[in-house]
Amino acid sequence: METTVRKQKKNLETKKPSIYSLQLHEMQDWLKEQGEPKFRAGQIFDWLYKKRVKNYEDMSNLSKGLREKLSNSFDITTLNTLVKQTSSDGTIKFLFQLYDGYSIETVLMRHEYGNSICVTTQVGCRIGCTFCASTLGGLKRNLEAGEIVAQVVEVQRALDESEERVSSLVVMGIGEPFDNYDNLMGFLRIINHEKGLHIGARHMTVSTSGIIPKIYKFAEEDLQINFAISLHAPNSELRSKLMPINRAYKLPDLMEAIKYYVNRTGRRITFEYGLFGGENDQVEHAEELAALLKGVKCHVNLIPVNYVPERDYVRTPREQIFLFEKTLKDRGVNVTIRREQGHDIDAACGQLRAKERKEETR
């Protein structure tokens, strides 16, 4: 009987590229190399993203020869579901296993306006935010575009049973999306394409901790995707304490990049601001934040933090959250408090994965 380690080693040795990593034009190029007509690419995408088949044999309008070529060239398997937690509010958290044994998290959130999914872009994270469970254990590797796509496909398959669909997505799961930029953009283009899952660009949001060169690059992309910055502090000193990335990419330089993005795209930016009891949640912090954002076309999303056992931060009291919000509103800042979801499951980013890793080491 094969051990888990031996199976993982075999998977690494025999791994083929994921078919879910291919954009339509890349599929067309591959078909041309195989002497096949390029219209077959649309048929293949239809099987993958509309019918969501799990094997090539089901692609009945393709020749046997083409199905064999696909099978020999590309892996069609997606992800193995290790854990599926369902909250009382309908939020579902998936722990998926990758081909090499690593695990990642994906979250389905239900809203009045539809179903939203939060996807992961890396196994672990190197950014080192002091409040985040995702950084525990460091960065293991980047996800391929197909592994990010597969998260959406798997969640959509789960929704197919109730004839629902994923209507929006946020790239705010484990990892720093801009630290895996090329695979991120490949994923977004596949998911957005009318032959893919066809999720509208304006229904997708990418969040970054502030990798400044990639913000300038993102401003030049042709997709009208919503953009969010994990800010969490109104000044450099406090931000460096909470987010070590601020030592490399200073807050004043970050704000310049953000202003360039807003002016270049004409789109509003969202600032994510987690509230940590006694750290960044006082009235003076709100006043300083309002001054920092003055003149910037933006929205502030206040996030009551989830408790992470491995971290020391505590939740801001409810009345203090409302006072912080009021202080911003009184100074003309567009602000909302994020609705909490999945409070009765391991909802904080990286929490379920960290719990699973801890159990594996016992």
Swiss-Prot record:
PROSITE patterns: RADICAL_SAM
Single GO term (MF): metal ion binding
Binding site for S-adenosyl-L-methionine: 175-176, 207, 230-232, 306
Annotated TM spans: none
Bridged cysteine pairs (disulfide): 118-349
Record field: catalytic activity: adenosine(2503) in 23S rRNA + 2 reduced [2Fe-2S]-[ferredoxin] + 2 S-adenosyl-L-methionine = 2-methyladenosine(2503) in 23S rRNA + 5'-deoxyadenosine + L-methionine + 2 oxidized [2Fe-2S]-[ferredoxin] + S-adenosyl-L-homocysteine; adenosine(37) in tRNA + 2 reduced [2Fe-2S]-[ferredoxin] + 2 S-adenosyl-L-methionine = 2-methyladenosine(37) in tRNA + 5'-deoxyadenosine + L-methionine + 2 oxidized [2Fe-2S]-[ferredoxin] + S-adenosyl-L-homocysteine
GO biological process, one term: rRNA base methylation
Active-site residues from the entry: 105, 349
The protein's required cofactors: [4Fe-4S] cluster
E.C. number: 2.1.1.192
Domain Radical SAM core: from-to ranges: 111-344
Main function: Specifically methylates position 2 of adenine 2503 in 23S rRNA and position 2 of adenine 37 in tRNAs.
Name of the protein in its database record: Probable dual-specificity RNA methyltransferase RlmN
Species assigned in the record: Bacillus anthracis
